[in-house]
Amino acid sequence: MAVYFVTGKLGSGKTLVSVGKIQDKIVAGCKIATNLDLRLQNLPQVGRFAKTPRVLRIPDKPSISDLLAIGRGNDSYDENKNGLLVLDECGTWFNTRSWNDKERQPIIDWFLHARKLGWDIIFLVQDLSIVDKQARSALAEHVVYCRRLDRITLPFVGTLYSLVTGSKMPLPKLHVGVVKYGDSQLSPTVERWLYTGKNLYNAYDTKQAFSSNYDSGVYSYLTPYLSHGRYFKPLNLGQKMKLTKIYLKKFSRVLCLAIGFASAFTYSYITQPKPEVKKVVSQTYDFDKFTIDSSQRLNLSYRYVFKDSKGKLINSDDLQKQGYSITYIDLCTVSIKKGNSNEIVKCN
């Protein structure tokens, strides 16, 4: 079983990375229980047509009866199939006063024995220091420190950008959760959770307020198919054209830039002069009247200069380019072959 304390300042992405882990567990077919208000149909990897997610909504501050009601998270011995329990605003549960509260003791005991019930747990707190030391020692197997990369200023480049534009250099909204094995920042890093903000913002209520007077008990979310998918109607041609116009208007600048680059590349490719290919014209020769005018030997290679009946000199390299095969016999005798023709040429 894995227990995570996810920490970070306000807006650092604690809930977002936790919803990302919920999505991963749903895709793996695992059971989920949480006090977060989720919109399952907006999870990118789940979608509105999913029929199998098993997600339970528990009260904002669950009692022991609520935790007992969610049952087992995994009936097998394979811990990769463990269910995931995600609880936000846990700072009020694990401070020194609450840790020794007799009414909260059964809940704490349940957390200590959650492994036997097949549950992985994610606790969300703003800072680990507000958690009682005994609770940290007993439960904080992993501690996750959340950071938002768009709030970080790049050295030199960010300063130069601010001087030129007068504003902070925009960076992608990437949320990073650094997972430490232990409750110290010096503990070894075991993994990093990386999630982009935009595709998960609509999957949960970012303005959810937690209350001790939550009036509903434990209930199960409807699957996305039952709540949204079965009511989906395919778009007709007019609606598709309307969406096309909207997206073309939205991405018109990028599209025009891409078309400009493509047009310039195509024009340069078409108008580029093609290299001239030298064609070697094969001629026929009367090798009966050829004689070897000179010969040259360099290591294992030979070169000959032939003379025809008119006194014209032709070297062996030109003949080979025209497809003739020249076989050395001796410095004064060669065999010239092409196709079925084979002639012996000697010195004069």
From Swiss-Prot:
GO terms for molecular function: ATP binding. It is a single-pass membrane protein. ATP binds at G8, K9, L10, G11, S12, G13, K14, T15. Residues 274-348 are periplasmic. Residues 1-252 are cytoplasmic. This is Gene 1 protein. Isoform G1P plays an essential role in phage assembly. It is required to increase the number of adhesion zones between the inner and outer membranes of the host cell. The extrusion of neo-synthesized phages occurs at these adhesion sites. May be involved with G4P in creating zone through which the phage assembled and extruded. Isoform G11P is also involved in phage assembly, probably playing a structural role in the formation of the phage assembly site. One of its GO terms (biological process) is viral extrusion. The chain crosses the membrane at residues 253-273. Belongs to the inovirus G1P protein family. It is found in: Host membrane. The gene is I. InterPro entries: P-loop_NTPase, Zot_N. It holds the Pfam family Zot. It comes from Enterobacteria phage fd (Bacteriophage fd). The keyword Methyltransferase does not apply. The lineage of its organism: Viruses, Monodnaviria, Loebvirae, Hofneiviricota, Faserviricetes. Interacts with G4P; this interaction results in a complex that spans the inner an outer host membranes. Its main location: host cell. Coiled coil: none annotated. GO terms for cellular component: host cell membrane; membrane. Keywords: ATP-binding, Host membrane, Membrane, Nucleotide-binding, Signal-anchor, Transmembrane, Transmembrane helix, Viral extrusion, Viral release from host cell.
